[in-house]
Amino acid sequence: MAVYVADPALDVRQHEYEMVWVIQPEASEERIEDLKSRISQVIQREGGHISTIDVWGKRTLAYPIKKYFEGYYLLYHFEMDPEGTDELERLIRFTEDIIRHLVIRLDE
């Protein structure tokens, strides 16, 4: 379901997204919190709103990814302008601690 902003000055169409990302298993709690903060800041800076953050914790991977057999999983539900996802993807791609991610648009 698309959400329309009521303020005409901010007349952008926002979409609902779900993002799962997997962090290297040996990442410290401080590093995980730092990554969560950076991702959240990008979403908010791009005009988005985070609905929920679910921490799934450390889980065994179905197959090795970058020589890792486990990963620390997080799930985000958020709304944001489609053009803002480019900046989010850029941040995730250039963060070495994130070994896998998937962003899915939920509406439609």
Predicted ranges, named:
Residues 2-108:
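Structured, basic alpha/beta domains of bacterial-type, RNA-associated proteins
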